[in-house]
């Protein structure tokens, strides 16, 4: 895997800032990711569960809906469905 010293330095700087879920580094990442992918509609989340909940909400999933999922999935994959009042 690719690694250079500047990555460790930046990681230490981010951790020392106390802003690991928000702040200038998240904004910088979002802007860089959007530019690299040619898409200005980028939303970052702090974890996969919140990303799934946001995607489900934006897809119109809500109370009373059924969402197909795998029975061999971890709890984090199904909890956003239940949080929205839908049935996994």
Segments predicted by a language model, with ranges:
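Phosphate-binding glycine-rich loop
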Residues: 19-66, 77-84
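N-terminal "arm"/small-domain region of PLP-dependent enzymes with the aminotransferase-like
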Residues: 1-20, 24
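Short beta-strand->loop structural element characteristic of the AMP-binding/adenylate-forming
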Residues: 70, 87-88
